[in-house]
Each structure stands twice: as C-alpha cells, then as structure tokens.
Amino acid sequence: MAILVRPRLLAALAPTFLGCLLLQVIAGAGIPEKAFNLTWISTDFKTILEWQPKPTNYTYTVQISDRSRNWKNKCFSTTDTECDLTDEIVKDVTWAYEAKVLSVPRRNSVHGDGDQLVIHGEEPPFTNAPKFLPYRDTNLGQPVIQQFEQDGRKLNVVVKDSLTLVRKNGTFLTLRQVFGKDLGYIITYRKGSSTGKKTNITNTNEFSIDVEEGVSYCFFVQAMIFSRKTNQNSPGSSTVCTEQWKSFLGETLIIVGAVVLLATIFIILLSISLCKRRKNRAGQKGKNTPSRLA
C-alpha cells in the first residue's frame, strides 16, 4: 500500500535533508572544519591550548605570535585537539600572546597531495584563541605546607615555594621569583573542636599567628596574587592539625628509634660472631703449627 506524503511536509524536510547531505559531502571531500571552543588550560605556567572537534580528513596546525608579532608553527599537522605551548609563553610571562588553530586538508585530499598551510594562495580556515597573558591568566597550583609548629601561644607555618616552568639562565624559577611581593598566602585556621574560622594574609611564605596555648588547631593555606581582579586565589592546600602532627612525629620517632635499636643489635651480634670466628681460626692455626725443637 502506497504511503502518501504531503507536499508541505516534503518542503519542510527538504532543507534538513539537503543540509545533512551537504555535511556528508564536505566530510567525504576532506574540506576542513574550523576549530571551536578554544580554551587555555594553564597552571603555574604549564600551558596547553585545547579546542574541538576531532578532525576527519584534515589536520590541525597551531600558530602563536611572539613579541615581534611573528607567527610560529606549533603542533604541526596534528590530529590531536590540544597543543602544549608552555615553551613559548614562559619566554615572557608579561606578554599577551595570540594564537590560532588552522584546519589543514590532509594528504590525498581535494586540495592536493600534502598538508598545506596555503591553499590556492589563501590561508586555510582558522579560529583565533582568546589572548593569553600568563602573569594574569595562569592558575595557581595547590600550595604545600612545608612545616609548622605550635610553640606556646604561637603557631608558626612555612609554605613551600613551588617551582614553575619559567626559566632564567637555565634554572627554573619559583613562584616567589616570578611574582615577587605580588604573591601572597592566606591561612584559614580554626580550633580543632570548633567550626568558627579565622584568616590571616602574608606577602611572604611564613605565618606567625597568635593562638591559645594547649589548644589544637587545624588549618590550610591558599596562594594569591594581589594585583589580580579575577582568578586571584589558588585551591586550598590539604588541611592539617597540630595534634595530628604531634601524633605523627611521635609515631615517626618510635619507628626511627626501633629501626636504630634493631640496627645496633644486629651490628653488635655481627661483631661478636666475627670475633669468635677470628679466635677459632687463630686456635686452629696454633694446633696445626709443629713445635720447634730447642
């Protein structure tokens, strides 16, 4: 039995059908699609540019501009949807970098036998990334508490100065060396038995906080950049408590003491065993040596 289709329905479905058909033809012909959703992912200056979609019948090449506004090719003819640009942006973290992702026809495509950055005298389709200023835009990594001590009415905390991928004279610089006094730390602390929190800010890597004597405190720290209006703070460090630290130190000292004691006993027993062997050998040699006649 034949199914009747209304002319109006056919007219409505025609554009959709033709659009799908056109997309299939384009994909089959290897005509590249422009990248979209270009996003900078950066922490402590480790910087990757990500985008979509996954390519079919074409590749991507990333270009980034330097201070001379020259375009440099990176991740040439890649099928990945990300490109590590760390080695370029750490050259000057105060420069606003421009980047773009080019969609380049693959080999044996309709445009020729090889991946080309120029097609019929024109640049292939590309998408510009947002400008990226590393000093302002890189995220701060999670800080690490290097050491702390509760001494009477003072809680002293030292934050580890993290290394970055920024180099000077072949040496990696710390966050402090990059940001100077613009880098600060926030400590959030509370009594171990309380939920009420207090904060303190320093532009160094050390805190000295007034606390109650004999009371346990829990705290965590965050890095911050004073000059930033957005993206100012890092994630918080792991939370630690002074009583936990004392317990940890006690357990550590017990373990270390036990290891030292066992090592000492082993050395003593080994020494006794070696001495006995030497005496036995000396006695054996004495028996085997013939007596001289007077």
UniProtKB/Swiss-Prot annotation:
The chain crosses the membrane at residues 252-274. It is a single-pass type I membrane protein. A motif (WKS motif) lies at residues 245-247. PROSITE patterns: TISSUE_FACTOR (PS00621). A lipid is attached at residue 275 (S-palmitoyl cysteine). It is found in: Membrane. Residues 275-294 are cytoplasmic. Residues 29-251 are extracellular. Disulfide bonds join 75-83, 218-241. GO terms for cellular component: membrane. Its main location: membrane. Induction: Expression in the liver oscillates in a circadian manner. It comes from the Eukaryota. Coiled coil: none annotated. Glycans are attached at residues 37, 57, 169, 200. Keywords: Blood coagulation, Disulfide bond, Glycoprotein, Hemostasis, Lipoprotein, Membrane, Palmitate, Signal, Transmembrane, Transmembrane helix. Pfam families: Interfer-bind, Tissue_fac. Interacts with HSPE; the interaction, inhibited by heparin, promotes the generation of activated factor X and activates coagulation in the presence of activated factor VII. Initiates blood coagulation by forming a complex with circulating factor VII or VIIa. The [TF:VIIa] complex activates factors IX or X by specific limited proteolysis. TF plays a role in normal hemostasis by initiating the cell-surface assembly and propagation of the coagulation protease cascade. Belongs to the tissue factor family. This is Tissue factor. It comes from Mus musculus. The gene is F3.
